[in-house]
């Protein structure tokens, strides 16, 4: 695995990673820690804690972080500049979060959040929190433990990994009841990132593997670690700014972040302005 190396160490089983608009790298921990990471120096600073268990993270245009806390069953918002930590969403009025897993913004400030539901209970859904903070059930097309998600480059589709199907699917933003299967997978897929060629990078909880899926569904394994030391439950990844040619991958099974260079360029995340 010559394209894969340990980037930084000293984190508590980090599942989620994200990059803010200014290029700052953040990660979460299994005791609710929010970490700020400097890839150039290897410095890891814990800047806050929710007291729960963090899964996915993303950032808005002002650099505030939106963190899925599975223990609290809430999406929390944290301002790294002012230190304010608050509850952003507990789910919709008629359906509370069961397992809020991964958040992704669109350009209009809508936050799509996968609610995985129970393991193998086929009761997951995707919620949407609009820019005013109102939460609704957006789609029930994906029920098989919807996990990581990513908005397409054109903003017209949401890519979702279903851990228990297992499959990579796509839901058109304008047709939330539609579920298009891009590829049937094996193992337990967890997170997804997209590149500028329309390919999806799939990160697995089990086995310790990273695949690349072409738009036509062809699957290529890019890295696998039978020992589970360099890649250890590599659950999610994010492209490092500014060039977005390096993927930073979480290691839920250990205490480090991994850097991967697969000869590709990632798409830029959305950073909308939220009141």
For each predicted feature, which ranges?
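Beta-rich, blade/repeat-based domains predominating
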Residues: 9-22, 31, 50-69, 92-116, ...
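A short loop-to-beta-strand structural motif that recurs across blades of beta-propeller domains
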Residues: 33-35, 74-76, 124-127, 167-169, ...
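Beta-propeller domains
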Residues: 26-45
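C-terminal closing repeat unit and adjoining cap/tail of repeat-based domains
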Residues: 206-275
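Structural signature of WD-repeat beta-propellers
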Residues: 29, 70, 163, 204-205, ...
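A short beta-strand motif characteristic of beta-propeller blades
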Residues: 3-8, 42-48, 84-94, 134-140, ...
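Short loop/turn segments that connect beta-strands within beta-propeller blades
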Residues: 38-42, 79-83, 129-133, 172-176, ...
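A basic- and aromatic-enriched beta-loop-alpha substructure that forms the phosphate/nucleotide-
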Residues: 64, 70-76, 80-82
